[in-house]
Amino acid sequence: MTIRKIYQIAFFIAFLLPGKSNGQISQGGIPIQINKQKSASFTTDLVVMPAIDNLKMRDKYSRTDQNMLKQFHFAHSFDVSLSPNNSGKWYNTSEVNVWQIRIRSTGAYSLNLILHKFRLPDGARLFLIGSNTGEIKGAYTSANNSDSQVLAIEPVSGDELLVQYEEPVGVSFRGEFLIAKVAHDFVGITGDGVHRPLGISGSCNKNVNCDLANGDESIRDAVCRIIIEGTEICSGSMINNTALDGIPYILTASHCIGSEIQAESSVFLFNYEMPYCSPNNPSTDGDIKRSLSGSSLKALFDSINFALVRLNNIPPYNYRPYLIGWNRINTAPAYSSCIHHPLGDIKKVSIDWLPAQTGTFSSGYQPNGFWKILKWDIGVTEPGSSGGPLFDQNKQLVGALTGGSATCNLPTNDYFLKFALAWDYRKETGKQLKAWLDPLNSGASKLTGMYLYSGKMLCKPVTNFKDNDTHAAIQITNGLTKKGYYSGSNLVGFTEFAEQYKFSKNCEVQGVSLGIAKVKTNPLNASSLIGVQVYSGVNQPETLLYTEKFVINRFYNDAMNYISFQTPV
């Protein structure tokens, strides 16, 4: 078999190929910098939320979460009503009108917003910018318009953010949106920077890409982290149906998404994981850019604790969307595994090598309606794991997490809803899975999974890291003199760095994830670019296949940063 070897020039914080950026870039664009002396309308652009005591809020939810359900409360939501018609400031030019408002909730680790009545014309752009970090979310455009007119946005680090709306002169209609909720993070879901602090979930948890999870690559790609109404975190998974038509259904727990408004106000984050195991060096976070906002509720039944929603948008091909296969036969799996996001952390895997038992979760729930894990052999589940899929020995879904008492100190007694019972225990289409996952009425008891873009010959993720490898920013030294970094800014003339990846068959490379230690640049300066090149070759880079430049200030420190090529290679 021919081996195709792809070489890519890695990112360097040496500002490879510096230059000016023009127009739209692949990471979503750069907000316009405006002359603030051209302001009009309102007298203030700062709105401050009522004070919150983070410690008291954490204590409150740690007590309310003692019912064994495993959603993760991390934020308090304020109801507001802020729009370009009643708040903020407008800045007008001959080509574009720009509206800004600043929102502060003192002491928040991060802020997130939920927008209602969201309807933008073509050409308009909306950004959220962290006032302290320069983190940029957006641009949100007419592509984010939906029937629900709801847009939920991932958290922005820090206790103050700037909302900036840009509308070209002469658009077909005036854009509309209402900031309806501001959520104050009292836990630290993004830590002190823009990313979640690692090591917060239990130390017994294992990264999903450790060698012990070999063979789980496909089902791993189906699992997502869900932020519901800006305040809670759960897990969920994309699931296949017998029509094989690629409808993006997500299965989770009903105590996570329990209503249509919660479905509409949810954010689904895919591929939030480490690309390697890193058991002894958990200092690099996963990529947080591949998310989708909004869904519609299709089916729910509380006493079995399942919810099925349909995403408003089909995940793009570079999300690697996989639709999990399932087994609805009510037979205990010989052994079980669960992939989930404990405490909102990067994706983890838990394994029980013994057969699951039938059990009852608690009063108010269907008797004997759950798979009981007596004891985890590897990892556990935690708050934030609710809704995470349970797989049998054939990697088919047989349940989803409701809750339990398992901890790293005592990894016992977790409960997963039975997929077999959720299938058609109730006959109403809004309270069963059968109507949605077997639209052909085929009577199938099992279904295999599939990648949503199976015909595109996409390359599978590859890495050169092994389980026990570590990483560090290595300085170049000459005696006592420090001359910079091997893969960053330096005084010895290193301007490029190559890494070799091997693929067993011809396939499309869609992008690359880069571990960035630190970036220093003006958050709104669009002039600093860095280049990525893809080569083919045998023992060294030989034939240039692709090159693209990226704006440096869109990268996150101490984290994996996924960049998508505008044209797959």
Task: Name each model feature, range by range.
Residues 1-28, 459:
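Bacterial Sec-dependent N-terminal signal peptides
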Residues 156-374:
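Serine endopeptidase catalytic core focused on the charge-relay Asp
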